[in-house]
Regions:
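Phosphate-binding loop of NTP-binding sites
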Residues: 88-91, 100-207
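N-terminal leader/targeting and accessory segments in enzymes
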Residues: 1-121
Length: 207
């Protein structure tokens, strides 16, 4: 008998959820995850996206050029603020997406909560829209190795299964709609990303 993992039907598509929203992405980063998330967000056609980072580095310029072109092609307004995160960006945007390197207890995010601004991260957005069953791996050490090996084992039963999460260039949100709904996704999820995950969780969790 074939193995099955149950799924949960989601009420909205990403495009419906992000329509007419002004987005703030805090943290572009240089490891590729922030860039991939920004690409995905732009393709959902929000009204606008502001991307901020506390660093002001020439290393960002290739990513900025590519994201600017992508935004123009998708008719999305885009703005970059480098060297700081600003209060005005918290106040003027509808939804805040935080990079995993951003501590959740910084004053700007405290302000966001006071102003009732929704705060999301890669994992929480992923669980708003995922139609596949998921297996989550968290813990102190060995998460990536465990994630890759579990995916390797699952491929014997689910050849189209994929893995990602806290892995460079493979953020969870970029995995949406990549494989048929009944095929599982194996995720590496750091504990600090789980802090924002409220009423959703992996179908199977490993610590």
């Amino acid at each position: 008998m074939a193995t099955t993992l149950s799924t949960t039907r989601q009420p909205q598509s990403p495009a419906e959820f992000f329509a007419k929203k002004n987005l703030l992405q805090m943290g572009l980063g240089i490891l590729g995850g922030g860039f991939t998330i920004a690409q995905w967000l732009i393709k959902q056609h929000p009204k606008s996206i502001t991307i901020t980072d506390s660093k002001n580095s020439d290393d960002f310029q290739p990513a900025i050029k590519k994201l600017t072109t992508l935004a123009q092609n998708n008719k999305v307004k885009i703005k970059f603020v480098l060297g700081k995160h600003r209060q005005q960006d918290i106040l003027t945007n509808d939804l805040i997406i935080v990079n995993q390197a951003i501590p959740l207890d910084i004053p700007l995010l405290k302000l966001a909560r006071e102003k009732k601004k929704p705060i999301e991260n890669d994992i929480t957005l992923f669980y708003k829209f995922v139609k596949n069953p998921t297996l989550g791996i968290t813990g102190t050490r060995g998460k990536t190795t465990t994630t890759i090996w579990l995916h390797h084992l699952l491929k014997s039963q689910f050849p189209k299964s994929i893995f990602g999460g806290n892995i460079p260039h493979k953020p969870a949100i970029s995995l949406l709609n990549k494989i048929p709904p009944k095929n599982p996704i194996v995720l590496e999820i750091p504990s600090f990303q789980l802090e924002l995950l409220k009423d959703k969780s992996p179908r199977i969790a490993v610590i």
